[in-house]
Amino acid sequence: FDCILGFNLDTAVFDWGMQIQENQYRFRAARFDPTSDDGPMMLNRMHINNVHCNAAGMYIGGRRTGGMLHYNGKTITMAVTLPTGTHNAQPFRDGVLFNDSEANVVRYTGRGEGDEDRAIEVPIYGDEEMTHLWANDGEVARPHFARGLCQVTDSVVAGGSSPSTVSIYDLRENKRVVEVAISRDVRNAIHGLEIWPH
């Protein structure tokens, strides 16, 4: 519903909520109490798919947000524009790292002249290598869909793709160095990745 929920680890309750409202690329944070009966309208215009927090604030991405949004605790602004259909957008070095799910690639784009820009293809499997292709009806993540992303080092990232594959990408070398297919069933897909413990 174009919302972010905050989970309180001490009380084990979702006790903070924020709906992101947009009007012609102007964004507004509308706070609400998720424990009350009064909540936001049930809209899913932005298809929010990830939140990344650091000392600079909260970064929010979605398939239809137009880019990576930044919430500083008061206001929401567009930090950077991105292609439609992106997943897992997050600040990285001096730019942005994200899954360009429509193009089946992991992308890093720096703020410079493009010398550091990277686009590395996710693993591509032939139909004969995958199972349950009959389920690929648009309701599940299609094969080769890039989703799930986390930083390993300042030049290495882990990314997910469908069907259930985790790959390691070396941005310095601009290549995928290893992949592990957990399943070749198209009904199964990676959603998020994180280094543990963190």
Annotated model-derived regions:
Residues N44-H47, R64, T84-G85, F145, ...:
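Beta-rich catalytic cores
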Residues N8-T11, Y71-T75, G110-E113, L171-N174:
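Short loop/turn segments that connect beta-strands within beta-propeller blades
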Residues T11-N44, E116-R142, A181-P197:
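Surface-exposed loop and turn segments in beta-propeller and other repeat-based domains
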Residues F1, C53, I60-R64, F98-A103, ...:
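Conserved beta-strand positions in repeat-built beta-propeller and related beta-rich domains
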Residues D2-L5, G66-L69, N104-R107, T165-S167:
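Structural signal for beta-propeller blades
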Residues A55-G57, R93-G95, D154-S155:
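Short coil/turn segments that connect the beta-strands within blades of beta-propeller domains
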Residues D15, T77, V177-V178:
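A structural motif specific to WD40 beta-propellers
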